[in-house]
Amino acid sequence: MKIGFLIKDLSSGGAERATVSLANYFALHSQDVEIITFNGSDSFYPLEELVSVHTADLGEIEQSASLKRLIGSVKRIFAIRKIVKQRNLDVLIGMSFAMTWYAVLATVFTRTKSVGTERSNPYRYKATKLNTFLRKLFYYFTDGYVFQTKRAAEFFGGKRSSRDIIIPNAIFNETVYTLSPPAERKKIICAVGRLIKLKRFDLLIDAFSQIADRIPGYMLFIFGEGEEKDDLENQIEYLGLKDRVILAGADPQAVKFVNYASVFVLSSDFEGMPNALLEALAMGVPCVSTRCEMGPDELIEDGISGILTDVGSSEQLAEAMLEIIENPDFAKKLSENGRKLLKTHSIENISRIWLDYLKTI
């Protein structure tokens, strides 16, 4: 089977990691795999040599002029279509909503099937009337759709029998499988994600500042890069926490550091299905997460495998972190229950479900 993935680039991020991991698995299981990107062929994550990467690179499409933007998008569709036909793909998977509509239009009147994916929160992400209309419109023109959660499928009116499927995120980071909970955890609180507004790292930093004096020696490490970096650095300096809050940048091996943390925190306003939280739970790191739409409450049973807090509440985040740090027995219970996800969300299991599904399209 000739399988294609369509994604903007192969930088660091959840969709990018999922793309690379699925592509690697498919290639190692006798499938021909191609990845089509918009911006370059370099991958942040290790990519098997068996996987080919092609670039439909037209540079940055001008956003200010509607006509130029439209012309640029049309050119890109034809660039993708050319690659699809040259490689004779059986299926092209759009690894986001934007990539899904490109996949649909690029495969019109070809033998290639288009499969869409919903990786964000369709109820909240750019939730304009036009965006909602386009999401649902292109959904019906795909040959299949993969959802990460039941809630996402409900947004589109439920599954269309065998054409659609709900497949939760796998633990795509292979390093996770090689790690065991440490005998003694370090005085570290960790978070991982792009430094963008919806991740609410400002909220986490504020929460940490509320309990910093009560947990001497503890430090907060945030792994990731993004547009909010300068604002977060200013916040850290304003709160007098330069020696205790570290913006550690993007690091593909951050998971090894997280494994030793006393607490992992996800502070987002909303998510699709957070890879970083899934990995931390599977490693047995005691976790705190906002009860944001779609994702955390499908991974965490509150008080059993982690702690869920109200979205936007720095006070609750602070209290939850403190509860874990001050109660070792409670932290151990969260660790043991969270680690059960290592089996249910293994890359072998989830990737096999993906491949079996694609063969039915």
Residue ranges and their predicted role:
Residues 250, 269:
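Aromatic "clamp/platform" in nucleotide-sugar-dependent glycosyltransferases that forms part
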